[in-house]
Amino acid sequence: MAPLFLPLLIALALAPGPTASADVLEGDSSEDRAFRVRISGNAPLQGVLGGALTISCHVHYLRPPPGRRAVLGSPRVKWTFLSGGREAEVLVARGLRVKVSEAYRFRVALPAYPASLTDVSLALSELRPNDSGIYRCEVQHGIDDSSDAVEVKVKGVVFLYREGSARYAFSFARAQEACARIGARIATPEQLYAAYLGGYEQCDAGWLSDQTVRYPIQTPREACYGDMDGFPGVRNYGLVDPDDLYDIYCYAEDLNGELFLGAPPDNVTLEEATAYCRERGAEIATTGQLYAAWDGGLDRCSPGWLADGSVRYPIVTPSQRCGGGLPGVKTLFLFPNQTGFPNKYSRFNVYCFRDSGQPSTTPEASXPASDGLEAIVTVTETLEELHVPREAVESESRGAIYSVPIVEDGGGARSPP
């Protein structure tokens, strides 16, 4: 009897499967989805430090939306943030119920939702440096879901600037002029606060655009308490006499050109550095331009001249050999109190800047990434407490510029005998 059942079994095996299985397979294709989620705009989306940005995200229905009985309530909207391999929830909303993560409290909103169930755009304000990353918009409606993602880049950097000869050398008027001279502008209180929220710390009082003097502290300690009673925050001296002398907090944002490292075989003096850049259809870069390039990802473990006579280099991926364990624009000072630019006859590489519309006339010289570091003694990343006379600014520290002392007797940084 067994042979009589064999054809029947084969026929059953070859017969089409249940319709439900075919529906499942078809449901996996994007063509069968009820809707698609799309983020508009050219990636990466650009925001500015301390500013606001709206990430436009819309739901496009591919067939008429289901009736009220087909689904319960409004679509579920979820925004997430991805950076450094980690994912964090920004907010989750369904109808009038919205849950916002603590890190984004009072900073995010869905301006159109739920009045519009197809516009789930995210408004993000008080932008910080660590808001740069991938944002994902996900919508779930009934059994259907769809998502889209976009990269966001928050541009703009706040940095402390001081004269090479002395600390606290700028009146309010001279502070504004100094920032403009180095290709930047004086920072606003909002920009300094946004930088602080992104992790910036500097125990040095500096002018801001509203004629106040402030400084950001992450780790309260002796001589860096200010008016915060031992708590982290931005210390504020309030409105200060414009003739008083302090450092400055400058702000740089747009590069609008190409910044490159020039590395001639024998290095160059400051005067030779200017000529070197001109020969290549460029000019010697300003400090503000170097900070903007670093903010855009420039990483060079090689000290170079800048237009103000300072010698600096940008580090994105830190190492002990390249100035310690913190990223930033490293500055070479002659003296332990973090003053004194190198002698103009010392020899270093040079950072040049070429406008966007200016073609290259001569290829840039190439050199190892660590050229010139043989003569630099790297300091530790521990923030240094440096005290000044009490009459300058009572009980305040002057520490923690990214800096390394230099030695004038050999290697890549050389002075004539």
Swiss-Prot record:
Central nervous system. GO terms for molecular function: hyaluronic acid binding. Residues 23-155 form the Ig-like V-type domain. Glycans are attached at N130, N267, N337. The keyword Lipid metabolism does not apply. It is found in: Secreted, Extracellular space, Extracellular matrix; Secreted. Keywords: Disulfide bond, Extracellular matrix, Glycoprotein, Hyaluronic acid, Immunoglobulin domain, Proteoglycan, Repeat, Secreted, Signal. GO terms for cellular component: extracellular space; perineuronal net; synapse. It comes from the Eukaryota. Its main location: secreted. InterPro entries: C-type_lectin-like/link_sf, CTDL_fold, Hyaluronan_bind_Proteoglycan, Ig-like_dom, Ig-like_dom_sf, Ig-like_fold, Ig/MHC_CS, Ig_sub. GO terms for biological process: cell adhesion; central nervous system development; skeletal system development. CDD domains: Link_domain_CSPGs_modules_1_3, Link_domain_CSPGs_modules_2_4. Residues 1-22 form the signal peptide. It holds the Pfam family V-set. Disulfide bonds join C57-C137, C179-C250, C203-C224, C277-C352, C301-C322. Residues 157-252, 257-354 form the Link domain. PANTHER family: AGGRECAN/VERSICAN PROTEOGLYCAN (PTHR22804), BREVICAN CORE PROTEIN (PTHR22804:SF41). May play a role in the terminally differentiating and the adult nervous system during postnatal development. Could stabilize interactions between hyaluronan (HA) and brain proteoglycans. Belongs to the aggrecan/versican proteoglycan family. This is Brevican core protein. It comes from Felis catus. The gene is BCAN.
